[in-house]
Every structure is written in C-alpha cells, then in structure tokens.
UniProtKB/Swiss-Prot annotation:
Function: Binds to the 23S rRNA.
Stated name of the protein: Large ribosomal subunit protein bL9
UniProt key word Ribonucleoprotein: yes
Swiss-Prot/TrEMBL keywords: Ribonucleoprotein, Ribosomal protein, RNA-binding, rRNA-binding
Superkingdom of source: Bacteria
Pfam families xrefs: Ribosomal_L9_C (PF03948), Ribosomal_L9_N (PF01281)
C-alpha cells in the first residue's frame, strides 16, 4: 500500500515522502491518525497544493515540542507509593503515574510520551526517565520514588 506521509513518522519517513507499508499498518494506524493519506493521483495533487500548509503545521508542532523540552529539562518529580521496609513497592509506578505527577506539577505530559525501557518501577529510588515529545525531540527527566509515610 502506497501512502503520502503528512508528518514525520519515526522509522518510516518525513513529510511528503511516498512510502510503501503493509495494508493493515496504513489502513488501521497511519490513515486514521492523520499521519498519511493514500497515494492516489488526486491526493498527490492536493498534497502538492497544500505542501506549504503541512510544512508550517509540522514546524509549529516541532517548535511546541522544543518549548516543552526546554521546560522539562532538569525537571524532577517525587512520587510517594506504598512500600515495604526493604524498599519494594506494593504495586508499581508506571508511565501513567509519572505523567500524572508531572501534569500536577504544572508540566503537562501524556502517558504515551513517557518511555520506560525496563518496565515499571517496583523499588523506591531515583530514576532517569526518557520522555519522547516528538519524532526528533527527546529529553530525560528525574523521577524519585519514595515510601509513603
């Protein structure tokens, strides 16, 4: 299935690229998410006519992500969770908990932007967490998990 990308897609291509993808990936993810359109002649002509508009939109999204990165750099948040005396958590701290803690601290973050390479945190301690804000914009934030008093 041939598609025209309407924005940069990680590991696939940039704005305006003509890409071949499996039909399910295109039909069920890229097209419904507004990341691509089928590569018909009419869509190609329409894309070329609106190319400047799409590029301006992509620049605005990238600039917004860069602004959010500047606010998040060096930021840290403390999350209190139930824990045993040995420091093991009863449960875990995952991306949703981290996103909610940053949002409560005035730094809006979506759970899908929080990348935990080794899974949820199950012990108290200090962790560095990767935040993926855009295809080209990533930063690291600090999360401190402490035992509830």
């Amino acid at each position: 299935m041939q598609l025209i990308l309407l924005q940069k897609v990680t590991n696939l291509g940039n704005l305006g690229d003509l890409v071949d993808v499996k039909p399910g990936y295109g039909r069920n993810f890229l097209v419904p998410q507004g990341k691509a359109v089928p590569a018909t002649e009419s869509n190609k002509a329409e894309f070329e006519a609106k190319r400047a508009e799409y590029e301006a939109k992509a620049q605005a999204i990238h600039a917004d992500a860069e602004g959010r990165k500047a606010k998040l750099e060096g930021a840290s948040v403390t999350i209190a969770a139930n824990a045993s005396t040995e420091g093991k958590l009863y449960g875990s701290v995952g991306p949703r908990d981290i996103a909610e803690a940053f949002t409560a601290a005035g730094l809006p973050l979506e759970k899908s932007e929080v990348i935990l390479g080794e899974g949820a945190f199950r012990n108290i301690g200090e962790y560095d967490v990767l935040v993926h804000l855009h295809a080209d914009v990533e930063t690291t934030v600090k999360v401190v998990v402490v035992a509830e008093a």
